Amino acid sequence: MIILRKAAHVFFDNLLSVFCLPFKLNNRVCIFNSTGNVNYNFNSRFLFEFITKQRDSQLMCYFVVNDDVLREKLLNSGHRNIISSKSFKNKILILQAKAWICSTIEPPVGCFIKRRQRIVYHLGHGVPLKNIGMAENQISLVKRINRYIKLRMFSHVTCYSLFFKDVLYRAFNKNDAIDYLFLGQPRNDTILAESGECKIDLTISSLGSFSEKEFFQSKKILYCPTWRNYAKTRFFPFTDFEPIELNRFLEQKNIIIFTREHPYYKFEKPRGIENIKRIVPLNADVLPDVTPYLSCFDLMITDYSSIFIDFMITEKPVAFIPYDLEKYEKLVGFSKPYKEITSGKYIHSFSQFLHVIGNDSFSGYTKEYLSNFNVKSRGNCLEHYLKIQELIKLD
């Protein structure tokens, strides 16, 4: 029934799109969306909020959130122009908009009829370290067709830098009609924003049983491995792992490790972790978007997640646990050689893990390395805003 209902919505949206074809697009309307049209997150959220705060803006911006509970919560908290794409009125509004601005490849309505006059603008939700889109390894025929239909809609794609242009070019099916933009990630404007440290402390201090002094003086580590489509992702994947020893070490060094799982994939943690008070879950149900709070952590540990690129803005160290690197390269694949796109210490054992988290030495990142990712803490939203204004060409 669910599949039939979705198919009916797609059929209706495309029929409505055909009906709207003779009418001119509204140059002043921009529609934003994010994952599945049900979330309010990623780069589209931050650019939407930036543009709506510009008093001189002639743009009318709307953000599609089809989750009724979340939409109501956002509206009640003071957000404006948060809409559903399920009503007839809003479908017309969306189909007549000059620009669709997306964090993912999902359109704001189930329409796959491309209008050459419309700007379909891809912001992305992280610099692609892994193969994505049409460049992903081992794509099924059904997924390939689905991606082809969606990807062909885009007119402009953020590729961050010249270093990553070929990556996005392959991901978007080597489409030469797309304009690839060397612009940064809007969400990165929030990382070093004023009072970020206060925000994170107020948000997460209640998650653990720490005294105020203990919490504020602690070394805070964000441990956030990425997804696997072939197995559960393992936290602390060491054959010599000792939870009792880890607990003792964290207490002695006044370290708190915040573990963050990918919201859409399964994870596995070793026994005994649940008894360590200094290991605190910080998943999406507690903190939907961790980006604005990255400056509050002293060290990041990951495996293949692109979140470490955002974290480099803080000029703090990153460590990597590539415990299944060969398998990941074969089944998922990287957009660039792994050792070329990572800069930090590699951890292969529990003893190395303790050494890294207990050591504060860090030599920093080179300018050349940072330029590959177009890493900057300000001006990202503004450059996208100016680009969109230029493309729309308001009178």
Give short role names for the model-derived ranges.
Residues 272-277, 306-373:
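Catalytic binding pocket for nucleotide-activated donors in carbohydrate/polymer assembly enzymes
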Residues 83-99, 263-309:
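Donor nucleotide-activated moiety binding/catalytic core segment of transferases
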Residues 1-37, 42:
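Membrane-proximal basic amphipathic "stem/tether" segments
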Residues 42-49, 53, 186-272, 347:
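Conserved catalytic-core segment of nucleotide-activated headgroup transferases in glycan assembly
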Residues 29-195:
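Active-site and donor-binding regions of nucleotide-sugar-utilizing enzymes
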Residues 2-17, 133, 146-231, 263, ...:
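A nucleotide-sugar donor-handling region in carbohydrate enzymes
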Residues 376-395:
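C-terminal alpha-helical cap of glycosyltransferases
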Residues 100-107, 111-124, 128-131, 287-331:
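A donor-sugar binding/catalytic signature common to diverse glycosyltransferases
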